[in-house]
Structures are given as C-alpha cells and as structure tokens.
Amino acid sequence: MGTLQGLLLWLLLGTGGAQAPRGPLRPLCRPVNATLAAENEACPVCITFTTSICAGYCPSMVRVLPAALPPVPQPVCTYRELRFASIRLPGCPPGVDPEVSFPVALSCRCGPCRLSSSDCGGPRAQPLACDLPHLPGLLFL
C-alpha cells in the first residue's frame, strides 16, 4: 500500500468517518399510542379508542442485482407480546354481538409480516375513521 493510500485510510478510520451514526435516524420498532375506530354496520354508533400498536423503523436491505437472486424478505414492525382487550358498542339491536376485540401491544420486534395478525399494507390514503356518528375518548393501554 502506498504512503498516500495509507494516510487516507488512517484519516478515514481515525476521524470516525467509517463509523455508523450513534443514534437512529428514525424511531425504532416499539409500542406507540394510536387512535382507532370500531364500528358494526348493525349498530348506530362508532367508537374511537386509544390503544398501543407496534410502529417504527426496521432495518432492511435491497439487492443491487434484483434479477439475479430471489427477493429478500423485508422485516416489519410487529407484535412480540400482546394482549387482547374489547369494547362494547352501545345501542346494538338484539341478536347483534356488540363486543369488538382488538390487540394491545405490550412489546414489539422486527420480523416477517404475518397476514394472520397484521395489516402488511403500506400507508393508507385516508386514516381509519368512523363512517357512523361516533363516541370519542376511550383509552386502553
């Protein structure tokens, strides 16, 4: 190795130029509070409630030569531990189940998206909201 190359390598490594940033640029995968909506077409009202969901950044990779190799599965922020809570929609007619169950995130992890328990789609054009008149303000954490 030439003197100039050695000097450049020493400067790069000595000044920390080859190190990754110390803190994340985006929030990592973790439980966060979110307001969701619950409704049933047979019941007269919709309820908005606050619960904890998994959200945040998961490190991912994209192949430089995508045609040569199969795609790399991209991890998503998903539940590690969860519990289920439920709310009762008021004013439902007899014979209609007024209970709506939903997951409450206790801890999260980066992993494959499981369609059985997660919505693996991208951002929505419109946030989830009530189509019916709603009763706001329930909190489930």
Swiss-Prot record:
Location relative to the cell: Secreted
Signal sequence interval, chain numbering: 1-18
SUPFAM superfamilies given in the database record: Cystine-knot cytokines
CDD domains attached to this UniProt entry: GHB_like
Gene3D superfamilies tied to this protein: Cystine-knot cytokines
Database matches in PROSITE patterns: GLYCO_HORMONE_BETA_1 (PS00261), GLYCO_HORMONE_BETA_2 (PS00689)
Highest taxon of source: Eukaryota
InterPro entries: Cystine-knot_cytokine (IPR029034), Glyco_hormone_CN (IPR006208), Gonadotropin_bsu (IPR001545), Gonadotropin_bsu_CS (IPR018245)
Any Gene Ontology CC annotation: cytoplasm
Keywords, alphabetical: Disulfide bond, Glycoprotein, Hormone, Secreted, Signal
PANTHER family named among the record's database cross-references: GLYCOPROTEIN HORMONE BETA CHAIN, LUTROPIN SUBUNIT BETA
Entry function: Promotes spermatogenesis and ovulation by stimulating the testes and ovaries to synthesize steroids.
Protein name: Lutropin subunit beta
Species this protein is from: Oryctolagus cuniculus (Rabbit)
